[in-house]
Curated annotation (Swiss-Prot):
<dbReference type="InterPro" id="IPR020420">
    <property type="entry name" value="Atypical_DUSP_subfamB"/>
</dbReference>
<dbReference type="GO" id="GO:1903753">
    <property type="term" value="P:negative regulation of p38MAPK cascade"/>
</dbReference>
<dbReference type="GO" id="GO:0035970">
    <property type="term" value="P:peptidyl-threonine dephosphorylation"/>
</dbReference>
<dbReference type="Pfam" id="PF00581">
    <property type="entry name" value="Rhodanese"/>
</dbReference>
<dbReference type="GO" id="GO:0043409">
    <property type="term" value="P:negative regulation of MAPK cascade"/>
</dbReference>
<keyword id="KW-0832">Ubl conjugation</keyword>
<dbReference type="GO" id="GO:0090027">
    <property type="term" value="P:negative regulation of monocyte chemotaxis"/>
</dbReference>
<dbReference type="GO" id="GO:0004722">
    <property type="term" value="F:protein serine/threonine phosphatase activity"/>
</dbReference>
<dbReference type="GO" id="GO:0008285">
    <property type="term" value="P:negative regulation of cell population proliferation"/>
</dbReference>
<dbReference type="InterPro" id="IPR003595">
    <property type="entry name" value="Tyr_Pase_cat"/>
</dbReference>
<comment type="function">
    <text>Dual specificity phosphatase that dephosphorylates MAP kinase MAPK1/ERK2 on both 'Thr-183' and 'Tyr-185', regulating its activity during the meiotic cell cycle.</text>
</comment>
<feature type="active site" description="Phosphocysteine intermediate">
    <location>
        <position position="258"/>
    </location>
</feature>
<keyword id="KW-0597">Phosphoprotein</keyword>
<dbReference type="GO" id="GO:0043066">
    <property type="term" value="P:negative regulation of apoptotic process"/>
</dbReference>
<dbReference type="GO" id="GO:0051592">
    <property type="term" value="P:response to calcium ion"/>
</dbReference>
<dbReference type="GO" id="GO:0032870">
    <property type="term" value="P:cellular response to hormone stimulus"/>
</dbReference>
<feature type="modified residue" description="Phosphoserine; by MAPK1 and MAPK3">
    <location>
        <position position="364"/>
    </location>
</feature>
Length: 367
């Protein structure tokens, strides 16, 4: 398999991209975190769950390497002259783990995309970004939008949303989760200057009582759930994810908010990352928390997210994996998997310090 893969250095890839970037498919085999911190412009992140990796037994199907059906179809049709694999800094494929993402991707491409030349990028992203920084996209250390907290509030916001003050969760501005996805509070949603500065075109209001202030200017989607342990937020996951994707595909940006931007809206953002990037809850949670440190979904929402994880990462695993999240929670299923996250009690608008309840969250084990 290694003999069928060519070697490119940073200069070779730069020349290849200049000749025809549209005819070169870049597959980045690094982690979700590493890819989002910085990647070659136009590259696609390759990742799959531990369960899928284990079941592959060294022979991963191309549908797991390139899950996007359109890209995979172009690849199989010979539309790409070259496919380039890369990791962080490896000098060759010789040292790649046999069950690692890089080796599994190379094997699948050599078996199923035989009409396309497969290359390995020598030195990986580290060497290429040092040599060709202008061809890379890097995300700076995430910080909220720095705008002054005006004491004036739009007339539409003065009545109906009591959280439009400046407690901790309203300070700063919305935070960027992905280039097209932002998270924040109802106060931020009442600040048209903030939304316009970020290029927001649509909002998801994850509450039953916060108003949509600017319906004539932005596209809105309402998810009327309360922040309590009886609420079934998981029934909205797929609908919210599809809405975010539709805005992204149209070139827009989505701002997701609830009352405080801590529990309900954070849960929706976590579900989006888990399904679209096929990552585990703990990885998605850490990714979002690095950007908005006060996120703290309530106990029930965390349980529903853990059940959603089993559906996302092992969709063909068993009947249990596809069962509704709330049904599993109601059954009181015995547990063997324990995760520790900061988990909130329902949030109410007050100027007092935020309360956090540290406790392990459990759910039924995935297959």
């Amino acid at each position: 398999m290694v003999m069928e893969v060519g070697i490119l250095d940073a200069g070779g890839l730069r020349a290849l991209l200049r000749e025809g970037a549209a005819q070169c498919l870049l597959l980045d085999c690094r982690s979700f975190f590493a890819f989002n911190a910085g990647h070659i412009a136009g590259s696609v992140n390759v990742r799959f769950s531990t369960i899928v990796r284990r079941r592959a037994k060294g022979a991963m199907g191309l549908e797991h390497i390139v899950p996007n059906a359109e890209l995979r179809g172009r690849l199989l049709a010979g539309a790409y002259h070259a496919v380039v694999l890369l990791d962080e800094r490896s000098a060759s494929l010789d040292g790649a783990k046999r069950d690692g993402t890089l080796a599994l991707a190379a094997g699948a491409l050599c078996r199923e995309a035989r009409s396309t030349q497969v290359f390995f990028l020598q030195g990986g992203y580290e060497a290429f970004s040092a040599s060709c920084p202008e061809l890379c996209s890097k995300q700076s250390t995430p910080t909220g939008l720095s705008l002054p907290l005006s004491t004036s509030v739009p007339d539409s916001a003065e009545s109906g949303c009591s959280s439009c003050s400046t407690p901790l969760y309203d300070q700063g501005g919305p935070v960027e989760i992905l280039s097209f996805l932002y998270l924040g509070s109802a106060y931020h949603a009442s600040r048209k200057d903030m939304l316009d500065a970020l290029g927001i075109t649509a909002l998801i209001n994850v509450s039953a009582n916060c108003p949509n202030h600017f319906e004539g200017h932005y596209q809105y989607k309402s998810i009327p759930v309360e922040d309590n342990h009886k609420a079934d937020i998981s029934s909205w996951f797929n609908e919210a994810i599809d809405f975010i994707d539709s805005i992204k595909d149209a070139g827009g940006r989505v701002f997701v908010h609830c009352q405080a931007g801590i529990s309900r809206s954070a849960t929706i953002c976590l579900a989006y990352l888990m399904r679209t990037n096929r990552v585990k809850l703990d990885e998605a949670f850490e990714f979002v928390k690095q950007r908005r440190s006060i996120i703290s979904p309530n106990f029930s929402f965390m349980g529903q997210l853990l059940q959603f994880e089993s559906q996302v990462l092992a969709p063909h695993c068993s009947a249990e994996a596809g069962s509704p999240a709330m049904a599993v929670l109601d059954r009181g299923t015995s547990t063997t998997t324990v995760f520790n996250f900061p988990v909130s009690i329902p949030v109410h608008p007050t100027n007092s310090a935020l309360n956090y309840l540290k406790s392990p969250i459990t759910t039924s084990p995935s297959c």
